[in-house]
UniProtKB/Swiss-Prot annotation:
Name of this chain's protein: Dihydropteroate synthase
Outcome of substituting residue 69 to C: In strain: BT490 / Serogroup B / Serotype 15
Organism domain of life: Bacteria
Native source species: Neisseria meningitidis serogroup B (strain ATCC BAA-335 / MC58)
Residues involved in (7,8-dihydropterin-6-yl)methyl diphosphate binding: 66, 99, 119, 190, 229, 264-266
Taxonomic lineage from the root: Bacteria, Pseudomonadati, Pseudomonadota, Betaproteobacteria, Neisseriales
């Protein structure tokens, strides 16, 4: 499988070279930054601008924490967090991704305009989500694997074959989308790394080592989001998420070396610099 373009709203994102998705968290309980960018829209917008300057190709904006044990956030609160930021960045002329699992939030954002990608940790399982996206002509979609819900997904997760189970799940979700009329070139897949998505350390390592097989089995490009997650903390011994930059960059490079086309990261400059050197040296990890 060698697909070189991701149809994402107003953009055709080339996948011949790895792309960086910069994370803009608007959640006060974010595991990675403690909610520092959720204080007000201007703080979040300044952060988004900085990510673009540092080399982000895509901005991913989200208003609901999906960390392990995250508390419930109402749709009204989620929309109140993301709407003022989405309204502003929609006119920036860069690919904008909305990180949400709720159909009602997707619908409001798409009506607002300027939203190119729906990045859904629940793989469009919310009622009406597939049908809503099927009615859109070009909106890009990222379908992610998650076991359970954010509040409970790390309570005794079980897999017999994590790579096979993730592949089968994502194949089934993408097949449902295509059957509903969503063009395959609009779809990209995310295996869902981290304890926050129902996978302990050994399962995350297995998934990372078998990314080529996962991509071959599903037939779609991959987006990898492992930045600052507990997996990195467990491997490095770093309890503070903000101090997991070096491990996160290493994981991003390993992802790209194994075929991932997009990496979703908090630390854009460090990742962009590492990718520049890696590409220039032609390293095959």
């Amino acid at each position: 499988m060698a697909r070189h373009v991701w149809q994402a709203g107003r953009f055709e994102i080339g996948l011949d070279k790895p792309k960086i998705m910069g994370i803009v968290n608007l959640t006060p309980d974010s595991f990675s930054d403690g909610g520092v960018y959720s204080q007000n829209a201007q703080t979040a917008l300044a952060h988004a601008e900085q990510l673009l300057k540092e080399g982000a190709d895509i901005l991913d904006i989200g208003g609901e924490s999906t960390r392990s044990g995250a508390d419930y956030v109402s749709p009204e609160e989620e929309w109140a967090r993301v709407e003022p930021v989405l309204a502003e960045v929609a006119g920036w002329g860069v690919p904008i991704s909305l990180d949400t699992r709720r159909t009602v939030i997707m619908e409001k954002a798409l009506a607002l305009g300027g939203i190119d990608i729906i990045n859904d940790v629940a793989a469009l399982n919310d009622e009406g989500a597939v049908e809503l996206l099927a009615r859109q002509a070009d909106t890009g979609i990222c379908l992610m694997h998650m076991q359970g819900l954010p509040k409970t997904m790390q309570i005794n997760p079980k897999y017999q074959d994590v790579v096979g189970e993730v592949a089968r799940y994502l194949k089934a979700r993408s097949a449902e989308c295509i059957a509903a009329g969503i063009a395959p070139q609009r779809i990209i897949l995310d295996p869902g790394f981290g304890s926050g998505f129902g996978k302990p350390l050994q399962h995350n390592i297995a998934l990372m080592r078998h990314l080529p097989e996962l991509m071959a089995e599903t037939g779609f490009p991959l987006l990898i989001g492992v930045s600052r997650k507990s997996t990195i903390g467990e491997l490095t011994g770093e309890a503070n998420a903000a101090e997991r930059v070096h491990g996160s960059v290493a994981a991003a490079l390993a992802s790209v070396a194994r075929g991932a086309q997009i990496v979703r990261v908090h630390d854009v400059k460090a990742t962009a610099d590492a990718l520049k050197v890696w590409e220039a040296l032609g390293i095959n990890l």
